[in-house]
Amino acid sequence: MAVGKNKRLSKGKKGLKKRVVDPFTRKEWYDIKAPSTFENRNVGKTLVNKSVGLKNASDSLKGRVVEVCLADLQGSEDHSFRKVKLRVDEVQGKNLLTNFHGMDFTTDKLRSMVRKWQTLIEANVTVKTSDDYVLRIFAIAFTRKQANQVKRTSYAQSSHIRQIRKVISEILTREVQNSTLAQLTSKLIPEVINKEIENATKDIFPLQNVHIRKVKLLKQPKFDLGSLLSLHGEASAEEKGKKVAGFKDEILETV
């Protein structure tokens, strides 16, 4: 073999080790702040590349969506099965001001609620809040035994399901239309709407495990910095938000 064709021989002593640069030296940390609707406002930290030339770090941060467990935001394990999405809307120094972007249930919680000998009822509505946020809200409910019932099953008839679904849709539409996004979030945390649905449908068929299982943000109004700052407090320096009063779930008879 010719020497000129052998890459190992022709390389010589040129191959020096390249200087290894830590990629984290080009990045910086930002603190994520939740709205004052939640009790704990410190969500966590996020990384972003430092501002270089015309490329600004804040442009990469705005619109970023983070998913947080509601138990961490409220400091209570009672909300461990619910996930909240927060969207970064504004950058103030090293703080990222977020707004509510959606809510969902964990998969294990949804699977654990489905049992035999009962009927699953689902309903969803697309409605606009009083401050022009368009939301799609999904509700879920399960039938339970009536008082002094001997029969093992608690299946609802199709007519009952239609009536219950209609009542759920009416309550969800009314509650959302008469509330701002912040007010609606305050209702979703202690599950006030769930109890209202359960009481409104008890004459049709008794229900259990009534939940708003998902809230999806479809459309948002034009960004208003003033409303965002008021949502976080004027100075946005408080580490604690206002506490939302909750309640204890009633112990229902298992089926």
Curated annotation (Swiss-Prot):
Keywords: Acetylation, Cytoplasm, Ribonucleoprotein, Ribosomal protein. It comes from the Eukaryota. GO terms for biological process: translation. SMART domains: Ribosomal_S3Ae. The modification N-acetylalanine is found at residue 2. PROSITE patterns: RIBOSOMAL_S3AE (PS01191). The keyword Ribonucleoprotein applies. GO terms for cellular component: cytosolic small ribosomal subunit. GO terms for molecular function: structural constituent of ribosome. Component of the small ribosomal subunit. Mature ribosomes consist of a small (40S) and a large (60S) subunit. The 40S subunit contains about 33 different proteins and 1 molecule of RNA (18S). The 60S subunit contains about 49 different proteins and 3 molecules of RNA (25S, 5.8S and 5S). Belongs to the eukaryotic ribosomal protein eS1 family. This is Small ribosomal subunit protein eS1.
